[in-house]
């Protein structure tokens, strides 16, 4: 009697089992994984729209404002002193006060070299920082998608209604290793990506339309 009840359930034969060794399929949707994939796609889409260079520049500005930098402080001091020395040199006659003018000129030259050296150090630091941010963006977007595809390649995000789609479509949606009749992580990533693109396109179109309406109403001539 128990065997008859079990036969009414749905079964799958895992790889490596012999004939007759079946386990029931868990058709409960993987809600956590479903939301995680959707969040990763949304996050990647936001990063893509903002642009990596803009994010790098913004974070660099934040870091330089929050974290004290001796190089930035010294450059500012050198720049202020260079302006002061340049003004004094301009107001000093190179013929009547040559000694003073020459001293100011030497100091101004040293300050220019110092500022250039500091700029080179800051440029190198900025390049290293940009490389770190670029790597972090890659790992948290493309890298995360690759990890989800590999780690959960056999997971079923959710199950399709039985016999709702022909075999070729079910095969594509379960690619590469998810059970047939389910939606795999790879397929769900592509579905979410396409959906996000559509949502963003519609949103941008609506915003542009609203802005256009507001502008047209603003410039519309008043009738007497």
Curated annotation (Swiss-Prot):
User: What is the annotated quaternary arrangement, including any partners?
Assistant: Component of the Golgi to ER traffic (GET) complex, which is composed of GET1, GET2 and GET3. Within the complex, GET1 and GET2 form a heterotetramer which is stabilized by phosphatidylinositol binding and which binds to the GET3 homodimer.
Q: What PANTHER family does the entry give?
A: GUIDED ENTRY OF TAIL-ANCHORED PROTEINS FACTOR 1, TAIL-ANCHORED PROTEIN INSERTION RECEPTOR WRB
Compartments, as annotated in UniProt? Endoplasmic reticulum membrane; Golgi apparatus membrane
Q: Which GO terms describe its molecular function?
A: protein-membrane adaptor activity
TM ranges are 34-53, 138-158, 183-199
- The entry's keywords: Coiled coil, Endoplasmic reticulum, ER-Golgi transport, Golgi apparatus, Membrane, Transmembrane, Transmembrane helix, Transport
| Coiled coil segments of this chain | 102-124
Protein name, as recorded: Golgi to ER traffic protein 1
Q: Which InterPro entries match?
A: Get1, Get1_fungi, Helix_hairpin_bin_sf
Q: Which GO terms describe its cellular component?
A: endoplasmic reticulum membrane; GET complex; Golgi membrane
The stretches that face the Lumenal side, renumbered to this chain, are 1-33, 159-182
Read off the Pfam families from this record: CHD5 (PF04420)
Membrane topology type: Multi-pass membrane protein
Report the main location listed first in the record.
endoplasmic reticulum
UniProt keyword annotation of Coiled coil present: yes
Q: Which residues lie on this side of the membrane: Cytoplasmic?
A: 54-137, 200-224
């Amino acid at each position: 009697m128990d065997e008859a009840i079990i036969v009414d359930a749905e079964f799958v034969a895992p790889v490596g089992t012999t004939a007759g060794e079946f386990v029931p399929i868990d058709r409960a949707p993987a809600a956590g994984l479903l939301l995680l994939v959707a969040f990763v796609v949304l996050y990647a889409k936001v990063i893509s729209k903002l642009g990596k260079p803009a994010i790098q520049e913004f974070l660099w500005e934040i870091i330089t404002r929050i974290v004290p930098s001796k190089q930035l402080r010294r450059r500012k001091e050198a720049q202020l002193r260079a302006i002061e020395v340049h003004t004094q040199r301009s107001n000093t006659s190179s013929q009547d006060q040559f000694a003073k003018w020459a001293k100011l000129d030497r100091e101004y030259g040293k300050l220019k070299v110092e500022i250039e050296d500091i700029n080179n150090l800051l440029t190198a630091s900025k390049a290293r920082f940009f490389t770190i941010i670029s790597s972090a963006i890659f790992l948290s977007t493309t890298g995360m998608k690759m990890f989800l595809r590999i780690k959960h390649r056999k997971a079923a995000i959710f199950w399709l209604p039985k016999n709702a789609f022909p075999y070729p479509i079910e095969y594509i949606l379960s690619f590469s290793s998810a059970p047939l009749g389910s939606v795999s992580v790879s397929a769900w990533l592509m579905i979410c990506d396409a959906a996000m693109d559509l949502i963003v396109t519609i949103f941008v179109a609506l915003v542009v339309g609203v802005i256009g309406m507001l502008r047209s109403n603003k410039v519309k001539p008043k009738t007497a």
